């Protein structure tokens, strides 16, 4: 059931026209395959859970799982540093081998780290009263670390208002983004911008791990709140108008930071403080998350 309803939330942003024009044809190869994502990942959490309860698989202590999560993000940071060296052609001769070796390590760790992140977020949600009377969090926190899709945002030219959005494959180059934006402007007489995202509320959610442990916790909580909102009136009216979309995104952003920061403090002992925004937000500005 959850697979269908969460997919339906996003399909409003993914479906195309029955009579594709030049811009639709150009965008087509770059569209994110939401259905494929759901089929590939929907059962991952429950397969891992089943493996965990097998008698010969004992769950490591929480302290060890937290240390593994911190190591995972440290290794990810090392990979990014090496990739920058590779791009600048300033790295050592064995840089490819070093990247591959680190990547194998993080790939092996990833399922366990995802479970740790989900567990820590769930614990905070229970403390904050999101659980049922029997202590169950619904929907369960479920996330996969992956490259997050891009988003094509369409607006009228004479005022700022999101009238359409489409999820795109991650990793589209700046040159291709510019070509698509120019084509849409020329063919459809609307403004277009392609942006990157930190996560998407598929189920399980897509969460980018291009940042830190703290970032991943906040994004995971943000996307879970979208899942939870779906079963509340505020989420069921997400697509009614731009104001409702903004309300949903703002609530998920604020709540995601609070929940994520509390999970980060519980895991690391570090007290998190966030500086208040120095400028008032423009109510007509896009929120692309």
Question: Where do the PLM segments sit?
Answer:
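Phenylalanine-focused residue identity feature
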Residues: 32-37, 42, 50, 72-73, ...
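Pan-zinc metallopeptidase signature
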Residues: 1-3, 283-289
């Amino acid at each position: 059931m959850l697979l269908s309803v969460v997919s339906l939330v996003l399909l409003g942003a993914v479906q195309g026209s029955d009579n594709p024009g030049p811009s639709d044809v150009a965008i087509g190869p770059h569209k994110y395959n939401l259905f494929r994502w759901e089929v590939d990942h929907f059962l991952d959490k429950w397969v891992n859970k089943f493996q965990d309860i097998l008698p010969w698989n004992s769950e490591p202590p929480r302290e060890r799982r937290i240390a593994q999560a911190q190591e995972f993000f440290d290794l990810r940071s090392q990979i990014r540093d090496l990739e920058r060296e590779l791009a600048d052609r300033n790295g050592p001769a064995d840089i490819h081998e070093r990247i591959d070796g680190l990547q194998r390590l993080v790939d092996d760790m990833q399922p366990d780290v995802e479970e740790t992140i989900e567990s820590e977020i769930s614990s905070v949600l229970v403390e904050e009263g999101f659980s049922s009377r029997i202590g169950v969090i619904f929907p369960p926190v479920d996330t996969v670390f992956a490259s997050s899709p891009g988003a094509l945002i369409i607006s009228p030219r004479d005022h700022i208002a999101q009238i359409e959005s489409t999820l795109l494959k991650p990793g589209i180059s700046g040159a291709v983004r510019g070509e698509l934006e120019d084509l849409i402007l020329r063919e459809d007489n609307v403004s277009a911008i392609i942006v990157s995202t930190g996560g998407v509320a598929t189920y399980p959610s897509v969460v980018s791990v291009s940042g830190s442990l703290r970032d991943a916790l906040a994004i995971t909580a943000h996307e879970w709140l979208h899942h939870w909102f779906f079963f509340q009136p505020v989420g069921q009216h997400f697509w009614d108008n731009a104001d409702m979309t903004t309300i949903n995104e703002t609530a998920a952003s604020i709540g995601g930071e609070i929940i994520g920061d509390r999970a980060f403090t519980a895991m690391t002992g570090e007290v998190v403080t966030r500086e208040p925004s120095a400028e008032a937000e423009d109510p007509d500005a896009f929120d692309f998350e």
